[in-house]
């Protein structure tokens, strides 16, 4: 049985040419064009507060920039101390918790002859702190995990465009921005009425070298822990100082 093809019921020439709908769309475009051309649109009021003829969903970026909501996770930044150094103590907590593994840190240790500021109390600092913004999934776990409030995502700006992928890898000079802040975890803020020390010896700490761990205690304390000991009974272990002396713990290796 043959199938009978029906003709297009739109026999009107105006409907076939789409002229009415085309003119209607051009009219809307022209209306907004002349409204913006003669300055009838209010551009001084923030986008979220506009009403009437100025209430438009389209934002003329970059002349106008939308307001990011409170709590927006923007670009990362490293928070500086008063001396300009990053607050980061190279604890690797942000790099460990990052599900995208976009954070890379290399730690350095302050020498005993360092300046008489908080370097005597804070042991480590990052010699390298790198974030690959292309791999970041903007989850904010690094901010939550940091015990020193050293990394934040409160820049309220998105990742700007770049010409190469390497430009999306942010290092310390690119991340270190913003005003210095204080944090309750600072050693001189742990007790009420205490001040930032000018000369304080470090507490007992562990320094990891090539196969040896150098254990240092404050002057006047003894107990046989001031010598260099093997880093562990087997590979993948390191010694840690406690009140009872060095103990062996398993070192997590990626």
UniProtKB/Swiss-Prot annotation:
Subunit structure: NDH-1 is composed of 14 different subunits. Subunits NuoA, H, J, K, L, M, N constitute the membrane sector of the complex.
EC number annotated for this UniProt entry: 7.1.1.-
Membership in a protein family: Belongs to the complex I 23 kDa subunit family.
One Pfam short name: Fer4
Cofactor: how and how many bound: Binds 2 [4Fe-4S] clusters per subunit.
Organism: Myxococcus xanthus (strain DK1622)
Residues annotated to bind [4Fe-4S] cluster 2: 98, 136, 139, 142
Cysteine disulfide partners in this protein: none
Cofactor(s) in the UniProt record: [4Fe-4S] cluster
Positions of [4Fe-4S] cluster 1 binding: 88, 91, 94, 146
Name this protein carries in UniProt: NADH-quinone oxidoreductase subunit I
An example Gene Ontology molecular-function term: iron ion binding
Catalytic activity: a quinone + NADH + 5 H(+)(in) = a quinol + NAD(+) + 4 H(+)(out)
Subcellular location: Cell inner membrane
One of the record's GO cellular component terms: plasma membrane
4Fe-4S ferredoxin-type domain ranges (all copies): 78-108, 127-156
Keywords in alphabetical order: 4Fe-4S, Cell inner membrane, Cell membrane, Iron, Iron-sulfur, Membrane, Metal-binding, NAD, Quinone, Repeat, Translocase, Ubiquinone
PROSITE patterns registered for this protein in UniProt: 4FE4S_FER_1, 4FE4S_FER_2
HAMAP family xref list: NDH1_NuoI
Role this protein plays: NDH-1 shuttles electrons from NADH, via FMN and iron-sulfur (Fe-S) centers, to quinones in the respiratory chain. The immediate electron acceptor for the enzyme in this species is believed to be ubiquinone. Couples the redox reaction to proton translocation (for every two electrons transferred, four hydrogen ions are translocated across the cytoplasmic membrane), and thus conserves the redox energy in a proton gradient.
């Amino acid at each position: 049985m043959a199938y009978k093809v029906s003709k297009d019921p739109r026999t009107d020439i105006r409907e076939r040419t789409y002229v009415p709908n085309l003119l209607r769309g051009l009219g809307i475009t022209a209306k907004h064009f002349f409204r913006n051309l003669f300055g009838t649109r209010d551009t001084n009021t923030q986008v979220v507060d506009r009403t009437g003829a100025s209430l438009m969903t389209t934002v003329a970026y970059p002349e106008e920039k939308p307001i990011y909501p409170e709590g927006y996770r923007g670009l990362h930044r490293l928070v500086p101390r008063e001396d300009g150094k990053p607050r980061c103590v190279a604890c690797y907590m942000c790099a460990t918790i990052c599900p995208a593994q976009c954070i890379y840190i290399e730690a350095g240790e302050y020498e005993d002859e360092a300046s008489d500021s908080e370097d005597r109390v804070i042991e480590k600092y990052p010699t390298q702190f790198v974030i690959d913004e292309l791999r970041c999934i903007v989850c904010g776990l690094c901010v939550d995990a940091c015990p020193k409030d050293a990394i934040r995502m409160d820049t309220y700006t998105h990742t700007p465009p770049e010409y190469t992928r390497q430009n999306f890898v942010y290092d310390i000079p690119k991340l270190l921005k913003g005003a210095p802040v204080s944090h309750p975890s600072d050693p001189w803020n742990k007790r009420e009425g205490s001040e930032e020390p000018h000369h304080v010896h470090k507490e007992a700490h562990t320094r990891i070298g090539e196969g040896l761990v150098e254990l240092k205690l404050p002057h006047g304390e003894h107990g046989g822990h001031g010598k260099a000991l093997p880093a562990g009974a087997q590979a993948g272990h390191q010694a840690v100082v406690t009140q009872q002396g060095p103990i062996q713990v398993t070192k997590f290796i990626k």
